[in-house]
Amino acid sequence: AVTKACQGMLGEVYSRAYNMDIIMVRAFNHIGPAQSDMFVVSDFCRQTVMIEKNMHSPVIMVGNLTAKRDFTDVRDIVRAYSSLMKSGKSGQTYNVGSGNAISIQQMLDMILEQSSVKISVETDKSRLRPSDVPIIEADISKITDDTGWKPSIQTKQTINDILDYWREKEK
């Protein structure tokens, strides 16, 4: 958090002092096809596909499902960056996200709804973090006001696209 604050302040200082066109972005959780399975949504999707293909027992291993995060399709994030390049104000910091935090449990439920097989869920203690912020949610009013940008891809569509990516990759 401290490094992010310092980075933002440096951007503002350089923008003013050297008349540089600098726009700072605080991007929240990106999700989308081809994302590494080191990230929760892609991990759950990959596990689901492995189970569907009988390459894994029908159990998804999870960590904390109560945490709420602001997930946004990476394709919407790219559109946000493009909008900021065209209409963002130099020296300003913009939050880029969906503006809506949803629980990891809700994400998992959406993934399991799209699965072709019955899957159980088990907690793996090694996936639990010693400290987890309960809710992280972006206030996107500034980027919307300044550029007109809002995310347009529905979470269920993103999940479908991620599942399709893993279904193709794990042939």
Model-assigned labels for residue ranges:
Residues 21-26, 94:
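Rossmann-like NAD(H)/NADP(H) cofactor-binding core
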Residues 155-171:
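Amphipathic terminal alpha-helices
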Residues 2, 35, 39, 69-75, ...:
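Residue-level signal for the nucleotide or nucleotide-sugar donor/cofactor binding architecture
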Residues 77, 81, 96, 107, ...:
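Non-catalytic, hydrophobic alpha-helical segments
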Residues 5, 30-46, 53-58, 74-75, ...:
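Glycine/proline-rich active-site loop of Rossmann-fold NAD(P)-dependent oxidoreductases
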Residues 40, 44, 103-115, 158-162:
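PAPS/PAP-binding and catalytic site of the sulfotransferase fold
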Residues 59-60, 64, 91-94, 102-109, ...:
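C-terminal "lid/loop" region of Rossmann-like NAD(P)-dependent oxidoreductases
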Residues 1-23, 45-52:
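Active-site Tyr-X1-5-Lys
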